[in-house]
Amino acid sequence: WYPGKGDTLTLKMGYQGEKLLSCGTFSIDEIEVSSPASVVSIRGVATSVNSALRTKTSRGFENTTLAAVAGRIARKHRLKLVGSIESIRIDRVTQYAETDVGFLRRLASEYGYAVKVVSDQLIFSHLATLRSQEPVRQLKPQDVARFSLRDTINRVYKSAKVKHQKSSSKKLIVYEADGGTRESDKKLKGGKVTSADSLKVNSRVSDPDSARIKADSALARHNEYQQNGSLTLTGTPQLTAGNKIELVSFGQLSGPWLITTARHAF
């Protein structure tokens, strides 16, 4: 048997006797044979190599919504759009020599969403919802083989302001988001506020609601870097990107953490 480039593989992982975690369907795009010993390495990607998803395109969208743009691209590639998307008006947005997935990721991130393609699904995840969910597991220092955690004030802001003047009506739209970091996070032991900086967001908005969403999303996106780190531990299938964990007995860095990237190696 020899797999063909473009064939698909369905991957599940976990422990014998336990429920397996479905990792989705992958398209084979590279096969490598090496020796000694005889080893065959099969590499694949989550999006089909036969799809036009990676073709760069330039075009504009006018008088539409984020959900409509996502739906249009999903239909173009015969994907099922999964996830709840707020009714966000967009006067105009331009795709500049970008792949459809790259463009959607850029656009969605401005409004607080993450985008990925899994098999035949285009999945939108609301980041604020992910941050508010319950942790899937508690971890103590003895559960972890190695860890590195960092607490910083770099790229941390007290507020974010969006300001845009509509060319059609000359109306100035301004919105300021405040309180993106907790008071306990903003203070040092001496009681000093660690960041009083304001984030200026230069972005086109269609109305006050879209300005609010962009300001809140930009503030949350920057301030999530205040505390970040990495953990290495024995394989745990439920620890996937988008889930939360709770660190226990890690001192001031204890508490809930959102998983942004997970790598499982065998």
For each predicted feature, which ranges?
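Short, compositionally biased
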Residues: T25-S34, R59, A128-R131, L258-F266
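Extracytoplasmic
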Residues: G4-T8, L21-C23, A37-V39, K76, ...
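An acidic/polar, Gly/Ser/Thr-rich interaction patch typically located in mid-to-C-terminal regions
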Residues: W1-G4, V144-F266
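Short acidic/polar beta-strand-loop edge motifs in secreted extracellular
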Residues: N50-R72, V82-R106, E110, L233-G235
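Glycine-rich, acidic and aromatic/proline-enriched surface loops and short helix-turn segments
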Residues: S34-A37, T64-V82, S206-P208
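Assembly/oligomerization scaffold segments
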Residues: W1-V49
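Short beta-strand-centered interaction patches in the first periplasmic/extracellular domains
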Residues: V39-S48, I85-L149, I153
